Amino acid sequence: MRLLKTEAIVLKNNLIGETDKIATLFTKSYGKLQAVAKGARRSKSRFVNAIRPFVVANYVIFEGQNYYYIDQWELIEAHKNIEKDLAKFSVASYIAETINKILEENQKSERLYLFLKHSLKAVDELQIDPLIFISSYNLKLVSLLGYMPQLDNCVVCGKRENLKYFSNSCGGAVCINCKNKCFDAKPLHEVTLKAIKYFLKGDYDKLQNIKVSGVIKEEVDKIITAYMKEHLEIEFKSKDFINNLQNM
């Protein structure tokens, strides 16, 4: 019987059997795996809080015949503020969904793990605008995965002037002279380009007091969402809920 000891973040959980739950964990040492928490559906179970979404904890997990099973756990961070705030919860749910869909089973990435941990901590502790935070998170995520958009120079010719378009297929900003060389080049407002650069390079705490118009926020969101779809070939369902929150 193999015994695993690792820090992990709960991405989601589901019901299994009559009294158990199965959690999707992103572990620091072993990547993504599914682990059963026996009796976790009982209110007095010692595992009732062990697999709540977004919990960070140290786990002792053993490998059974068909599943991994949680044997022991010690809480590191509960992220209680996320539980109390619908906007924070929706952003955290989106973040967890992106990581879950990107990672294959048993795929390890300490850089991605630390990025997820940092992002959830920011959602929990900071005052956030959901759309601004998600745009910043998405830009940082695609960059971490190797798809950073080119924003300071034309992605085609390298010139820094007249960056008036953005192309998903070409991978970033495009100047006026090169717009016809990228079939999907779309007009890009100068303020939108500045916002994208700021969201990409600035840490989350710098986003708290930034003033961005609703039009620019939505334009940035549309650009980055389309860019992610182009390069990751994944769509995320929880993003729709965040968009609905913005319109409430």
Swiss-Prot record:
<dbReference type="InterPro" id="IPR003717">
    <property type="entry name" value="RecO"/>
</dbReference>
<dbReference type="InterPro" id="IPR037278">
    <property type="entry name" value="ARFGAP/RecO"/>
</dbReference>
<keyword id="KW-0227">DNA damage</keyword>
<dbReference type="InterPro" id="IPR022572">
    <property type="entry name" value="DNA_rep/recomb_RecO_N"/>
</dbReference>
<dbReference type="InterPro" id="IPR042242">
    <property type="entry name" value="RecO_C"/>
</dbReference>
<keyword id="KW-0233">DNA recombination</keyword>
<protein>
    <recommendedName>
        <fullName>DNA repair protein RecO</fullName>
    </recommendedName>
</protein>
<comment type="similarity">
    <text>Belongs to the RecO family.</text>
</comment>
<keyword id="KW-0234">DNA repair</keyword>
<dbReference type="GO" id="GO:0006302">
    <property type="term" value="P:double-strand break repair"/>
</dbReference>
<comment type="function">
    <text>Involved in DNA repair and RecF pathway recombination.</text>
</comment>
<dbReference type="Pfam" id="PF02565">
    <property type="entry name" value="RecO_C"/>
</dbReference>
<dbReference type="InterPro" id="IPR012340">
    <property type="entry name" value="NA-bd_OB-fold"/>
</dbReference>
<dbReference type="GO" id="GO:0006310">
    <property type="term" value="P:DNA recombination"/>
</dbReference>
<dbReference type="GO" id="GO:0043590">
    <property type="term" value="C:bacterial nucleoid"/>
</dbReference>
<dbReference type="Pfam" id="PF11967">
    <property type="entry name" value="RecO_N"/>
</dbReference>
